[in-house]
């Protein structure tokens, strides 16, 4: 899976976290493991230009998705197994997202993770134009984000336990411990 991030926003953002959450969602949604995704972080002026050009709406927005192919959620059961493909581009505006995060009372990193999940779901054919679509997409978005955070917590616990076990085994003489 190839995920490219280009930060042109002028803001310091954890590209590793964006890649992590995008990779998690793509895997969880059973997208081909060789799929490609591009993410671009832009400033408010650039996002406002894109928003006007593609949506005919004034001002910046938080996230826009540009799929390479029109996909539908779930696909068809009788269709052949899809091969690797370019999913498309996600454009994020960290400065706009920062304002949203402040209003929501959570960190910018959380807002960007949420918007990344949202953008990937749009690339996979999900939409929220109708109430039922919104309910489905936002429910899935929140579940995926919650699952990603749980996955991160589990990985941190596992790493802490592995470090503790290595230290104990080193003290017991099973192998050289870093603190000996």
From Swiss-Prot:
UniProtKB keywords: Cytoplasm, Endonuclease, Hydrolase, Metal-binding, Nuclease, Ribosome biogenesis, rRNA processing, Zinc
Transmembrane regions listed in the UniProt entry: none
Organism: Rhodococcus jostii (strain RHA1)
GO term, biological process aspect, one: rRNA processing
This protein's name: Endoribonuclease YbeY
GO MF annotation terms: metalloendopeptidase activity; RNA endonuclease activity; zinc ion binding
Family: Belongs to the endoribonuclease YbeY family.
Gene3D superfamilies (UniProt xref): Metalloproteases ('zincins'), catalytic domain
Enzyme Commission number(s): 3.1.-.-
Domain of life assignment: Bacteria
Cofactor(s) listed in the protein's UniProt record: Zn(2+)
PROSITE patterns: UPF0054 (PS01306)
Role, per record: Single strand-specific metallo-endoribonuclease involved in late-stage 70S ribosome quality control and in maturation of the 3' terminus of the 16S rRNA.
Cellular component GO terms held in the UniProt record: cytoplasm
Cell compartments where the protein resides: Cytoplasm
UniProt-annotated binding residues for Zn(2+): 118, 122, 128
Listed Pfam families: YbeY
Note accompanying the cofactor annotation: Binds 1 zinc ion.
InterPro entries cross-referenced by the UniProt entry: MetalPrtase_cat_dom_sf_prd, YbeY, YbeY_CS
């Amino acid at each position: 899976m190839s995920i490219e991030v280009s930060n042109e926003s002028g803001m310091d953002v954890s590209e590793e976290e964006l890649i992590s959450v995008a990779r998690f969602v793509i895997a969880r949604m059973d997208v081909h493991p060789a799929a490609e995704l591009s993410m671009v972080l832009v400033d408010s002026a650039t996002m406002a230009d894109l928003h006007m050009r593609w949506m005919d709406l004034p001002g910046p927005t938080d996230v826009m998705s540009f799929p390479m192919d029109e996909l539908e959620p779930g696909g068809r059961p009788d269709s052949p197994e899809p091969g690797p493909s370019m999913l498309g581009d996600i454009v994020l505006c960290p400065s706009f997202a920062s304002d949203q995060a402040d209003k929501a009372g959570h960190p910018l990193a959380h807002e960007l993770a949420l918007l990344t999940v949202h953008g990937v779901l749009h690339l996979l054919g999900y939409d929220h134009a109708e109430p039922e679509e919104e309910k489905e997409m936002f429910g899935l978005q929140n579940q995926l984000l919650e699952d990603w955070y749980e996955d991160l917590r589990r990985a941190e616990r596992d790493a802490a336990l592995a470090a503790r076990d290595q230290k104990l085994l080193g003290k017991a003489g099973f192998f050289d411990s870093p603190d000996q």
